[in-house]
Each structure stands twice: as C-alpha cells, then as structure tokens.
C-alpha cells in the first residue's frame, strides 16, 4: 500500500512539474510574440524603407521636374515633402497660408513643392509619403485649437490618400534652437494633432517624433517626449554631427523603430560645434565626392547596418543646397551640392549599396507589406 501511495505521489509531482513547464513555455512564447509586434508601417528586422527628398527638383520624376532622384535611380519606397500650420508667417518673401506645398506649387526659399503633382503621377504610385509638418511660431495656437481648421483639412486630405502609408513628422527637429519651440506647447500641439486625426478616422498615418540629432542628452529627449501612445516612430537628422546622436539608444529603450528622416552629406570643420560650418562638398568635384563617401556615406550605411533591429527607414536629401536662397547664409549647407546623379563615383556606390535586399523600394506589394496584419 505504501509503495502504491509513493508511486501515486511521484506521478502527481511529475504531472505538476510538466504543467508548470508547459505554462512557462506558453508565457515565454507569448512574451516573445509581444516583443516582435511591429509599430505602424514598421518593416521586419533587417529591412529598411528607402525615401528620397525633399522638393520637386531634388526628387524629379515629373514632366517639368525631370532631373532628380526618380530620374536616375530606382523609385524609392517613399518620398519626403514639407508643409506647415504657420499661416501668415513670411519666409524669404513668401507669405505662408497654411498647408503650403500640398495642393499648390509653393516656394518659401527652398525649391518649389507640390505634393499633389507627385500623388497624381503614376511614377509615385507605389511610394509611401513622408511629411515634415512645420509648426514654428504657431505651436501654441495649434495646441489651443486655433488652427483646428487646418488640422481638419489636412485630416480629410490624408484620408483621401487611401492605403498610401504616410509618415507624419510633427514639428520635426523639435529641439533645434532655430525652431525655438516652447516645449510644453509643442507637446500639447503634437498630441492635439494626433488626437484630432484619430477622432476623424485617419488610419494611414504613422506618427514620427523627430529630433535634430545632436547635442541632445537623454534627459532632454525624455522631457520633450509626447508619450508612447502618441509616437509610432522616433526620428532624427543625420548631418555633420551624426556621431553625437542619442536617439537610437532612446528609441531602442522605448521599443520604437527609428526613421533617419533627413540625411545629406555635410562634413565637419574644426569649428562646426561653435558656428555650424561644414566643408565645401560638391559631388561634381571628384575629390570632394570621394571624401564625402568616406567621411559621410560610410558612417551613414554603417549606422543602418549596425542597427537592423531599430533603423527601419531613411530619407536621403538629393539636394543642391547651395543654390537655394534658404541656405545661402547657412554655414552648414551653403557650400553643399549633394545630388547623387552629379557624381558617377557616388552614383555607382549608391546603387550598389541600395540594391541590397535590406532596402525596400517602390513595388506593387510595398503598401501591403507595410500594412501587415500585425500592424
């Protein structure tokens, strides 16, 4: 009898331990599955959406604007443009009306912008859209509801784009001194825009919180953060001081993907930290093109390759900066012509690098991939 009791006890203990192991395995599996959940429009690890920007000449692909990125390289996975909620402000003689560059061709010191031309052109049919939304001088008005008409108009327009993924960079480069945003008003404005769009049923937008990318301690980033429920992607700009960023670390801790939302070769001089001055970099100059590749492109691609779990989108600015009035007096961009197509050396290397399976370009199934069931 005692032997039978002992056997039964052993069997009960074995069954109990087996159940516990099964429960633990289930819990581990569930945790693993939760960790693999992707953000809105985030591709799987080891994939990166390639964008090009950031005005009509730089991007090309149109009958009138036909010497830009789309005319010399494979159509990218997305294109980057800009607009604003800053009606009444003047930029280089142009008076902003709000939503400039969305429905009409407008020029505010950069080269002309008009998203409607691109969205109506079949060459752009399979490319996502990234938008830099300027709020400068008006973040409090936006936060207080004074600009709700612009928010509503933009929301209806976004819905009209159907399944085209839109990456909306609200108040991009929020901490840059040149934007002089008020932190509290900026956060309130960011949240109001998203809340309004959510209430309107806008579902084709991923919300990107983008810093300028350098001289940003972790505590500073924390203080400007709108909150996990308001941010789909973290973003930053990749220019001359690319090695100073904390955004990748910040995003990884938050479980957010990273969009390098502005990237163009600018090479530091010894005084870059005091006056922002970068070296002359003109791609049609073979020596300067080689230096740009070694000192900027190599670190740029290394950043992508070294962070496949986080860096999931990048936007190259294919711009002749020095020819735009906006940048004539800007020490960072005034001596830069970063158009890839003006250098055979850089063009070949760019094509070789971006032809790797890592990069997502325009394709008939790109939107389906970005709209995956788990997103």
What residue spans do the PLM features occupy?
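Active-site cleft segment of glycoside hydrolase catalytic domains centered on the general acid/base Glu
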Residues: 141-231, 240-253, 323-354
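N-terminal carbohydrate-binding/catalytic regions of secreted carbohydrate-active enzymes
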Residues: 49-160, 296, 321-346, 354
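Substrate-binding cleft of secreted/luminal carbohydrate-active enzymes
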Residues: 46-57, 166, 269, 274-375
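Active-site beta-loop-alpha junctions enriched in small/polar residues
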Residues: 53-56, 82-86, 134-136, 171-173, ...
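Structural preference for beta-strand elements that scaffold enzyme active sites
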Residues: 78-80, 126-130, 165-169, 204-208, ...
């Amino acid at each position: 009898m005692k032997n039978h009791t002992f056997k039964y006890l052993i069997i009960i203990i074995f069954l109990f331990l087996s159940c516990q192991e099964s429960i633990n395995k289930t819990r581990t599996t569930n945790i693993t599955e939760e960790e693999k959940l992707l953000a809105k429009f985030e591709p799987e690890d080891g994939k990166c959406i390639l964008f090009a920007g950031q005005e009509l000449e730089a991007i090309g692909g149109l009958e009138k604007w036909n010497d830009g990125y789309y005319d010399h390289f494979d159509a990218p996975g997305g294109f980057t443009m800009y607009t604003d909620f800053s009606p009444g402000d003047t930029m280089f003689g142009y008076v902003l009306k709000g939503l400039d560059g969305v429905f009409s061709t407008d020029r505010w010191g950069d080269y002309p912008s008009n998203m409607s031309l691109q969205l109506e052109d079949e060459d752009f049919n399979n490319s996502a859209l990234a938008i830099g939304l300027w709020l400068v001088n008006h973040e409090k008005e936006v936060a207080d509801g004074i600009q709700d008409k612009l928010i509503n108009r933009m929301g209806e327009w976004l819905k009209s784009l159907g399944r085209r993924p839109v990456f909306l960079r609200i108040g991009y480069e929020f901490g840059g001194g040149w934007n002089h945003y008020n932190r509290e008003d900026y956060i309130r404005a960011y949240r109001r825009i998203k809340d309004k769009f959510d209430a309107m049923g806008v579902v084709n937008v991923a919300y990107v919180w983008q810093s300028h990318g350098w001289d940003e301690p972790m505590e500073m980033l924390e203080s400007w953060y709108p909150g996990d429920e308001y941010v789909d992607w973290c973003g930053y700009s990749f220019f001359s001081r690319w090695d100073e960023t904390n955004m990748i670390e910040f995003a990884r801790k938050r479980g957010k993907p990273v969009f390098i939302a502005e990237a163009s070769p600018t090479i530091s001089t010894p005084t870059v930290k005091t006056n922002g001055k970068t070296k002359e970099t003109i791609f049609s100059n073979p020596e300067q093109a080689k230096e740009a590749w070694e000192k900027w492109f190599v670190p740029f691609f290394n950043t992508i390759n070294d962070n496949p779990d986080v860096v999931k989108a990048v936007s190259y600015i294919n711009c002749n900066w020095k020819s735009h009035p906006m940048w004539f007096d800007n020490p960072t961009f005034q001596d830069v012509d970063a158009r890839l197509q003006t250098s055979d050396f850089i063009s070949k290397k760019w094509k070789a690098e971006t032809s790797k399976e890592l990069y997502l370009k325009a394709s008939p199934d790109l939107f389906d991939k970005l709209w995956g069931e788990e997103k």
